[in-house]
Amino acid sequence: MTDKVHLGHRARKRFGQNFLFDDMIIGKIVSAIDPKPEDNLVEIGPGLGAITEPVAELSGHLTVVELDKDLAQRLIEHPFLGPKLTVNQGDAMTFDFASLVRDDKKLKVFGNLPYNISTPLLFHLFEFADNIEHMHFMLQKEVVKRMVAGPGSKTFGRLSVMTQYYCNAMPVIEVPPECFKPAPKVDSAVIRLIPKKPEQRTAKSVKILNNVCLEAFNQRRKTLRNSLSNLLTADELTSIGIDVTLRAERLSLQQFIDIANWIYDNKQ
């Protein structure tokens, strides 16, 4: 049996499949999720059920979103898991997570996210921040570092700003490659994301905030005078209290929000 086959299933490269099998790491992840019978739990990409099974044992029921038809069917037919799952066979990138909110009970979302689509999938999930209580995701360690990076760090970028705009983010566990089959070529880590309350998210337009980040970080080595020249003049930036000689990585989250709100108020 090759390293790509685990529990009779061949990992599919196009789905970014790497299956977690280390019991100690699985136990730590489940402890971090802390599933309870009253929780509205949602797993993205349950795969072969390594985390699904212990979570279902503690919660009694959960909803899963699985793109791979074979794996979805395998979960439906699973003698232990089948009755405890609501299986949605489909793409999490287009899934309406708000549809899973029941009796005003927010979602607790978790999963081992495919590394090849993790960033766009996170941005999709951020759109449902008001429907989510917390999230726990296995990601490439470098992605987790970028998500929690602060101003002045070389890894501080658009993902850092947008993650921290929507959520309080904390690394939980580091996971080496040998805990998976097949072993990925990168280190992994689990991150905890707790969405902020709506009143804490003060951007008047998230679309503009995201666009400011795209422009600012597109050419990281440029100063803000140049990198944001398509959006604001140097004088306009100065009027907001922004030092135009800085690079984007030196700005705080609040300064990005201030720029976005100024554009919303003055450039519409």
From Swiss-Prot:
Alphabetized UniProt keyword annotations: Cytoplasm, Methyltransferase, RNA-binding, rRNA processing, S-adenosyl-L-methionine, Transferase
GO molecular function (one): RNA binding
Record keyword rRNA processing present: yes
Entry binding sites for S-adenosyl-L-methionine: N18, L20, G45, E66, D91, N112
Cross-referenced Pfam families: RrnaAD
Cross-referenced InterPro entries: KsgA/Erm, rRNA_Ade_diMease-like_C, rRNA_Ade_Mease_Trfase_CS, rRNA_Ade_methylase_Trfase_N, rRNA_adenine_dimethylase, SAM-dependent_MTases_sf
Protein's UniProt keywords contain RNA-binding: yes
Subcellular location: Cytoplasm
Cellular component aspect of the GO annotation: cytosol
Top-level EC class: transferase
EC number: 2.1.1.182
Parts forming coiled coils: none
Main location: cytoplasm
Catalytic activity from the UniProt record: adenosine(1518)/adenosine(1519) in 16S rRNA + 4 S-adenosyl-L-methionine = N(6)-dimethyladenosine(1518)/N(6)-dimethyladenosine(1519) in 16S rRNA + 4 S-adenosyl-L-homocysteine + 4 H(+)
Role of this protein: Specifically dimethylates two adjacent adenosines (A1518 and A1519) in the loop of a conserved hairpin near the 3'-end of 16S rRNA in the 30S particle. May play a critical role in biogenesis of 30S subunits.
HAMAP family in the record: 16SrRNA_methyltr_A
Family: Belongs to the class I-like SAM-binding methyltransferase superfamily. rRNA adenine N(6)-methyltransferase family. RsmA subfamily.
Classification via NCBIfam families: ksgA
Record protein name field: Ribosomal RNA small subunit methyltransferase A
Origin species: Pseudoalteromonas translucida (strain TAC 125)
